[in-house]
Structure formats: C-alpha cells, structure tokens
C-alpha cells in the first residue's frame, strides 16, 4: 500500500521527505505488529498459522524483512531449545544469523535516512535490539552444540550483545529521566508529541508517529486508515483478541489447578479486555518492542552469567562480562509486564528458574533476603521488585502464569508450566491430573508433547507410580530424538523399583516376573544406544552417567558371582534420578517414608556386600529424606559420620579433598547439602558456616559429571547467602 523508495533496494538510499518517512514509520510499526502476532500464534500451539503470517508478510512489497527473520528465528529457537534436536538447532542458527545481518543493515539504513520511529530513542535503536536478540539466541544455540569452535564464536557474540545491550539500556534510562524532567517542568517537545489526524471534525492520535504531522498529512485519509489499522492490531494483541480466541477474561483464574477451572463463573463476558493494569495502552509498538526486548535479553544474559561456575565466570570477567543475578531477574520481571513474545519468553525463563525441574531456588534453603536500601539510587524505580520478592515471588509468579493460561488456551506449554508449579508446591497428584486433562496426541508442537510426557514421568516417580512412568518414558522413543539411552535406562529403573516393591510385599502384582525381565533388559541394553538418537556429537552428561552406572552394575555382578544381574545393583538408581529432578523437595510425607523404606530395608547381595561407594549414595539420599521428614539432626549426623569422611576432611584448619571418581556428582552435592543442614539447624547464625560448606562444594573439582547442573545450584545458593549476610 505504501511503497517507500529505497527500502529493500541494494542501491544507495536517497533522502526521504517527511511524508515518505511517516509512511515508512507506519509500515515498520505494522510489520512489527504482524510479527508479534505470528509469534503469539506459536505460543498458542499454532506454529503453522504464525509461519503463514510471516510468509504473507514476506511476499508483500517493501515488507520489513528484518523483523520477519527474527520472528522466524525466535519460533525456531523455541522449537530447538524445547527439543534439543540437531536439525532444529541448525535451522534456527541459520535463520538467526540472517536476522543478525539484516538488523545491522536496517539499523544503518534507518540512521542514514533519519527514520525516527520512537519519541524516546535515536533512529535505528529498534534494529539494535533485533540485532542483540538475534545475537544472544544464536550464541545460546552455539553453546548448546558443545563444539569448542562454536563455543568460542558464541563468546564473541555474547560480548557483542552484552555491550550493545548496555548501551541501549543506558539510552533508555537517560530517555526516561529526560521524560520525567519534562513532565515535572511542564514543557512539551513537538518532536515527541503524538501525531494528530483531523478528518470530518474528529481527531485521532497515533502514538506510532512521534512528531506533529503537516497539515496535508493530518487530512490524508489513507494515512489515517493505516494508522487506525495499526492501533487496532495493537489493541487486539494487548487484550488477546488477535489470534482467534474468545475473551481471555472468561478463563482468568485466581488459583492453580483443575478445581479452579471448574469454579470459573458460567456467565461469559463478550468483550476482550486487557488482563493486567501494568499494560500501557498508549505505548507505541516500537517503544514497547525496545523496552521489553532489552529487559529480556540483558536480564537473561546477566542471570546466566551469574550462575556460571567460577572458572568460566573469571574468563568472562576478563573480557568485560559482569552478571548480577538480582538485577538480571529484575529486568526479566520487567519484560514480563509487556503483553508480547518478550514477556512470554521472560515468564518461561522465570518459571524454569523458580519452578523448573532443577529449581535453582532450593526450597530447603529458604533464607529471607535482606532488603537493601535503594532509595538514593538514581536508577531506582518505584515498581522494581525488592530482594525478598525476587527470591520468593509467590503469588506474583502464579498470577503471571494464569494470565498466559487464559491468553493461550490451546497451548500445552502453559499447561505444562502450571503443572510444574503445582509440582514445585508439592501438589504432585494435582500436577498429574492437570497433565492428564489434555489429550497429548493433539499437541501440535512435537517438542512440547515430549516435554509434557517427560515431566509427567518424572512426577510419577516422585509418587512411586513406576509402571505408568515407565510407559510414558518409553513412548518418547517414538517422539523425541533427545537421548534414547536415558529414556531406556530410566524405564528400566522404574521396573526395577516395582520388582523390588513386589519382593518386599509392598506391592501385589502378577507382573513381578515381567518387571524383573524388563528391568534387566532395559537397564543393561540402554548403553547400546549411547551416541545414537542424541542431538550432540558426544554423549550427554546424563548419558555418561548411565554408562558409568551400568558398568558398575556389571562389575559388581561379576565380583559377587550372582546369576541375576539385578542382584548386582545396590542402591536403587531411580532414587538418584528423582534427586536430579528435585523429587525430595516435592514428595509428601507419605512418599518420603516409602522412599526411606526402599532405601534402608530392601536387601540383596550387592547391598549386603556393603560397598563403600554404594553406601555413600544410599546414606546421602537417606540423610536428605530424613531432613525433609523433619529429622534434621539425624540426617545431618548421617552426612557427617557416613558420607563426608569418605572424601573430605579438615586437617590443621585446612580442607583436604580425597578425589574420587566412582560417583562424581555425589561429592560436591553432599557438601552443598551439608550447607543446607547448617541453615536448617542454626538459621541466620549459621549462614557464615553455610557459606563455607558451599565454597567447599564449589572448590571440590573444576569439572565433573553433571557439573553444570550441580554447579549452577551451588552458585545460586552462594549468591543467596551473600545477599543475606
């Protein structure tokens, strides 16, 4: 409709008249709105519709190829990181690389022609944001590839993102400060006054054009119609009316779970309404994109850097990276206040941080955060979250998730996150019931389908429902290309525990022999799948864990000379898996008691051999079970007397480690858990000692099996202690 000469052309760009610039600014806002709508379709489990929208936009003359490329990159990034499959990651990387290149060209073009599409920021700022977003997502994919060459390139990309984000963030802060001064002084800047159209006596203000229109433009009906169309697109997106769903307000709940869904009022509201008072209806599309994009990217970047192990963190510090977990979380929270894809990705990141399978904020380390005085800070804002709220967002996080559930009713991704939140609160049965409420076969996004089944299996083992957990996990062999070795081993461990429960009389089943046969077959053949059907060129950390465990089981069978291979397995391996996925913090008292019984009362030749390494694993898990049951001192005594002395001692005031390789994850983990015991026993007075234990955990080894998972948890705990000391 509005062809702007020079856009999309390779030749030198001529200067544009104000009328041409106005048309270009509106076209840019339109294309960004179209891209935001496309990405929202994906978040509602309708990727085909979203990609079709982008195809339609690409086919139009003078469309904004940059935001379209980024939108495709974001869609493909979500698909790649949800499933970690090689082809998906390769495709996303190529698209994001294209978005990077286009962003630099678009930024240069906007600067040359002076295209001021924001009342706050200089020309080209929005493309600086698309560049940093493309760079950051591309770098994350490079890191996930575990190629040394790709990782080196990723550091360079992260560095570029980091510095440009800092620059843009400073521009935002300066612009906000200037805006406040103008409001205080009562002055008005014509350059930042929204454009006003006058037709037939009525006036319409367009916030997307950040300057006064000429008299001719004010009466241009085509220009007015286009501005009104963009306003309508934005209004529909902010209220959730843009992707074909009924009003979200009718689905908005105040509580989690299926019961709250059943308790929704029967009378329906027919008008679409925004779900949050935080949404600014008067904000221009480009300004919204800049704010939310910078907050999301810089926030996630800082949180990730803050969680990295000291060795890597030290290297990054040398090249200028600094990560503040608290500041990063605060920025991500700001991003979630925007009703766009940045807000949604920010919420997914927060859900993973607070309530994900690894739960970086350990429930047992419930230290109250100190409230630091920020009243004198120039950059402080009234709406910023304080330390305690960042640590335990509680209902704020719950309400943010429930808004997304209302806005995207067709997406299993948000339902999965609600189930994870229920699980994090110990409401395991409700979590499973919620996941059962959806027909998994109808989930369009294959990666989300895989995650749903995997999470349900994990939750089921916390409930000791091993039969169904095994069925779920084995079904992933036909759906996911992640790690067939781990899926097979996991299922075998489930059948092993069922067989043991039958042996102990805790479970009556005519399938006892079947459980035995399946456990033996799946556990011992799982290693044959290593290196196959996995997204990386080398085995995953969990794959290496499986290989070591199975080799241990085989060696013990040979050593003891037992006929049944299962008699060569001492501590039940399913309890290790449960620990890796935070099961001990989520089990009820009933399920913790059953865990304790299975760990302490089952007998077989391998257990009776009292192997030192197997006893260490058993005693570590028993100590955690006792702590969660409230027997804190008893659990601590087991850790001090039976676990720590096997690899750790203090001689003449100096820490001495005995380097062991039998179960590498267990040793730093035991030191980490010892810090939590000190906190539980001594409270705030014990924080200095807790920090000592955490530093010992961090110093145990530079690299070990599952070091990333354990190391991030330790680093997050150290940051929490430092904040409270």
Swiss-Prot record:
Residues bearing PTM Phosphoserine: 246, 377, 380
A Pfam cross-reference name: Iml2-TPR_39
GO CC annotations, alphabetized: cytosol; mitochondrial outer membrane; nucleus
Chief location bin: cytoplasm
Cellular compartment(s): Cytoplasm; Nucleus
Keywords, in A-Z order: Cytoplasm, Nucleus, Phosphoprotein
Modified residues (Phosphothreonine): 196
Entries under InterPro entries matching the protein: Iml2/TPR_39, TPR-like_helical_dom_sf
Family matches, as PANTHER family: TETRATRICOPEPTIDE REPEAT PROTEIN 39 FAMILY MEMBER, TETRATRICOPEPTIDE REPEAT PROTEIN 39C
Family in the record: Belongs to the IML2 family.
Function per UniProt: May be involved in mitochondrial DNA stability.
Protein name: IML2-like protein SCY_3392
